[in-house]
Amino acid sequence: MVREEEKSRWWWFESHKSSKHSQWLQSTLAEIDAKTKAMLKLLDGNADSFAQRAETYYKKRPELISFVEDFYRAHRSLAVNFDHLKSSDHYGSRSAKVPQQSMESVCDSNSHFEDADSEIEDPLQDDASAADCKEDETWQLEQERLKLIEETDALRKQLLDKDEEKREVIRQLSLTLETLKDENLSLKRRLAHHSLKQRTVLEFKPLNKFFGKLFYIMCDGNKVL
């Protein structure tokens, strides 16, 4: 049962946990994980009858909407930070070209500064390493952004499926109520008809007794004559 659940939620069980992430990214992803767990717990709630399932859905719907709003804000925050980091990298790569060109011109005009030039190469290499690290972090953020998009789409699909299921529950309840109304109306008509027949029989009983006595008196009178 657990393995089937993990397979159906591959988009969530395979994500996020890495020591290479920044503290802010780890905090954001941990918050998203907590929201995802809570949403899945709400979506997986089962009930024994159509009525209970419909009632549960309408009770949990505001909470689900709140979770989706939080999910959207977290996703938007990641996207904004990713775009900001990408823009910063672009600006840094352009500004780094100026000192590099100046260094090349100095080396061409003054051969005496070869040793000094070799000493200056170390910070440039450090800058290149830092740029590579930024590129790696940018790539990781891009992968996380794509994963978040997949997670959001999968969650939206799951919510739509649940909505359709709840609508089907409501349709079934409506049909059941209509059937009960028809049966109740039919039962009332039968009871009214049966009550009318009983009343008619009770009304005729005194008349039968009266006519019986009258017939008896008339018979006695004929005997006397």
Swiss-Prot record:
**Sorted alphabetically, which Pfam families does this protein's record hold?**
KIP1 (PF07765)
The record, for InterPro entries, names:
NAB, NET_actin-binding_domain
Q: Which UniProt keywords apply?
A: Cell membrane, Coiled coil, Cytoplasm, Endoplasmic reticulum, Membrane
Q: Which GO terms describe its cellular component?
A: endoplasmic reticulum membrane; plasma membrane
Query: Can you say where in the cell this protein is located?
Result: Cytoplasm; Endoplasmic reticulum membrane; Cell membrane
Entry GO MF terms: actin binding
Superkingdom field: Eukaryota
- Asked if the Swiss-Prot or TrEMBL record annotates the protein with the keyword Endoplasmic reticulum, the reply is yes
Q: Cystine bridges: which residues? A: none
Which chain positions lie within coiled-coil regions? 139-197
* The keyword Oxidoreductase belongs to this UniProt entry's keyword annotation: no
Which residue ranges does the record assign to the NAB domain?
8-89
The family classification in the record reads:
Belongs to the NET family.
Per the record, the domain comment is: The C-terminus is involved in oligomerization and is essential for membrane association. The NAB domain, also called NAB (NET actin-binding) domain, is involved in F-actin binding.
Subunit structure and binding partners: Dimer or oligomer. Interacts with PVA11/VAP27.
Q: What does this protein do?
A: Plant-specific actin binding protein. Part of a membrane-cytoskeletal adapter complex that forms a bridge between the endoplasmic reticulum and the plasma membrane.
* Name of this protein: Protein NETWORKED 3C
- Organism of origin is Arabidopsis thaliana
The organism that produces this protein has a lineage beginning with:
Eukaryota, Viridiplantae, Streptophyta, Embryophyta, Tracheophyta
